[in-house]
């Protein structure tokens, strides 16, 4: 099958690799190179780099919503368009441009976690199960019919990186299976029940509210690392918690109270045991190294 691929980040790489191995990728669309590093040199997206390695034509339009880009896509010989974390809204003229339309890999149990940050919200909200869906795109926000889906259980204390890698690889396999069987698949409309939206994360969401349970704070730590990170303020400095564990135990302390010399912190319910931290503009340290340079005294109430 001839395929146009649209994608940008590392999450999309396994699928493009599978498509290159099993089909003919006739064009790749990705985000424009962005300034990166201290020298602000332009860096190509992971998808851009992979396409160049395989001599696939690459296009980096600033928008899909103009006649020039739409005409270009119409001229590219392809049966289908595959879109994964591209970064642009795909207009109807492109959704309808090819025989089999546009397919999208979405890493959640649709209609739960429609939107920009399904992986992060799955962990932040403490979901015990999730899915990868192959969806035929329409003009709505992740509202298209489901062609194929695979459910799975989340392991205890799954990290964002672990979930990202699992869904990226599972999605690639699922998409290839979808293309093999596409003429025989009966699309399934999404349920009108259980709709939630995985809104894009903000930096402000990372600020810890110690009134929350230790469990929910731990979920945020695992779901917001590396960005925006979960943090608290101490001595006018921002300190990110990179790793922690939670204890479901009763206590009588004010939430935010440091209750041990090893930086165990009382929460609205339960206790958070901090394992790894990073003070702004400094390197990440495990708790023992951190406390050698920064004293946070027992009985301190963190804000």
Curated annotation (Swiss-Prot):
GO molecular function (one): methionyl-tRNA formyltransferase activity
Keyword Protein biosynthesis: yes
Record-linked Pfam families: Formyl_trans_C, Formyl_trans_N
Record-linked SUPFAM superfamilies: FMT C-terminal domain-like, Formyltransferase
Keywords in alphabetical order: Protein biosynthesis, Transferase
Catalytic activity, reaction form: L-methionyl-tRNA(fMet) + (6R)-10-formyltetrahydrofolate = N-formyl-L-methionyl-tRNA(fMet) + (6S)-5,6,7,8-tetrahydrofolate + H(+)
Ligand binding ((6S)-5,6,7,8-tetrahydrofolate): 108-111
EC number: 2.1.2.9
Keyword presence, Secreted: no
Enzyme class at the top of the EC tree: transferase
GO cellular component terms given for this protein: cytosol
Stated role: Attaches a formyl group to the free amino group of methionyl-tRNA(fMet). The formyl group appears to play a dual role in the initiator identity of N-formylmethionyl-tRNA by promoting its recognition by IF2 and preventing the misappropriation of this tRNA by the elongation apparatus.
Family, as annotated: Belongs to the Fmt family.
Protein name: Methionyl-tRNA formyltransferase
Gene designation per UniProt: fmt
């Amino acid at each position: 099958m001839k395929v146009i691929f649209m994608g940008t980040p590392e999450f999309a790489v396994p699928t493009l690799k599978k498509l290159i191995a099993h089909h003919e990728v006739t064009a790749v669309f990705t985000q424009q190179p962005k300034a990166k590093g201290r020298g602000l040199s332009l860096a190509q997206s992971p998808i851009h780099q992979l396409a160049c390695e395989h001599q696939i034509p690459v296009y980096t339009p600033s928008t899909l919503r103009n006649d020039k880009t739409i005409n270009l896509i119409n001229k590219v010989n392809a049966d289908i368009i595959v879109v994964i974390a591209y970064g642009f809204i795909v207009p109807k003229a492109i959704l309808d441009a090819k025989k089999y339309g546009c397919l999208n890999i979405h890493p959640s149990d649709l209609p739960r976690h429609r939107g920009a940050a399904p992986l992060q919200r799955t962990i932040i909200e403490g979901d015990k199960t999730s899915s990868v869906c192959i969806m035929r795109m329409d003009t709505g926000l992740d509202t298209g019919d489901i062609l194929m889906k695979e459910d799975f259980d989340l392991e205890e204390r799954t990290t964002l990186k672990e979930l990202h890698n699992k869904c990226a690889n599972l999605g690639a396999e699922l998409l290839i299976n979808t293309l093999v069987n596409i003429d025989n698949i009966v699309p399934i409309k999404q349920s009108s029940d259980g709709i939630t939206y995985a809104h894009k994360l903000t930096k402000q969401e990372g600020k810890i509210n110690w009134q929350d349970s230790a469990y929910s704070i731990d979920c945020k730590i695992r779901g917001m690392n590396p960005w925006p990170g979960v943090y608290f303020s101490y001595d006018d400095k921002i300190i990110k918690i990179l790793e922690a564990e939670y204890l479901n135990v009763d206590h009588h302390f004010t939430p935010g109270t440091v209750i041990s010399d090893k930086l165990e912190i009382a929460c609205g319910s339960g206790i958070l045991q901090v394992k790894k931290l990073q003070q702004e503009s400094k390197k990440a340290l495990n708790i023992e190294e951190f406390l050698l340079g920064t004293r946070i005294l027992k009985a301190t109430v963190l804000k």
